[in-house]
């Protein structure tokens, strides 16, 4: 088991602090360009509120991943190319984040927002091993393995479903962030303690994202 040494603690602190710094900057930019949530039946705000906080979280995650993480990882022998591992996820996230930012300003039609999510899902399916390619029936059941075509459709459908589920609950301050932190923390625990082989980079990537989201909370 690879320990979370002091270098990795600094990585997480860096993600947290960077998110704190970027959040007010993104808030000012959002107000200037009109990326705001207008009052409606789903929201409790009575005046337009900046709606691009996710951009601060994403930028904090990306900067931490590309600049701080390699400094920590270089001190340990790890048989994985981290950039090859995470770059497609970042590109997919960039597509979704950009689509969301444009939607915050211009209120895109649903078909265009869906197109952005589908493109991101295809990138992740094509260039990573994050795929819905099997399902283990609990309590001693068999492992069901899916063919490439079904794997493709299930993976894309899963990413679309999760993304839209998050969008649907985005009506109360802190709700999406809280749900995301709980979900990500569960994933981190499972990936570090309960997989047949520890996926350390997956765990650390998830925890970096958690730190970025937590940094968004104080502001």
Predicted segments — roles?
Residues 2-219:
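"…together with the soluble PPM/PP2C metallo-phosphatase catalytic core" -> "…together
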């Amino acid at each position: 088991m690879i320990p979370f040494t002091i270098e990795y603690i600094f990585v997480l602190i860096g993600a947290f602090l960077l998110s704190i710094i970027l959040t007010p900057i993104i808030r000012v930019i959002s107000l200037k360009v009109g990326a705001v949530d207008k009052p409606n039946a789903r929201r409790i705000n009575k005046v337009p509120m900046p709606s691009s906080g996710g951009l601060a979280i994403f930028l904090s995650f990306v900067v931490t991943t590309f600049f701080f993480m390699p400094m920590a990882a270089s001190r340990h022998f790890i048989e994985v190319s981290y950039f090859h591992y995470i770059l497609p996820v970042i590109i997919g996230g960039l597509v979704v984040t950009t689509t969301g930012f444009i939607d915050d300003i211009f209120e895109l039609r649903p078909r265009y927002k869906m197109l952005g999510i589908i493109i991101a899902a295809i990138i992740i399916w094509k260039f990573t091993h994050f795929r819905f390619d099997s399902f283990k029936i609990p309590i001693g059941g068999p492992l069901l393995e899916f063919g490439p075509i079904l794997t493709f459709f299930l993976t894309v459908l899963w990413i679309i479903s999760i993304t839209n589920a998050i969008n649907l609950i985005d009506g109360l301050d802190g709700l999406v962030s809280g749900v995301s932190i709980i979900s990500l923390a569960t994933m981190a625990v499972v990936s570090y303690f309960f997989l047949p082989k520890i996926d350390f980079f997956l765990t650390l990537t998830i925890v970096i994202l958690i730190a970025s989201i937590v940094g968004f909370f104080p502001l």
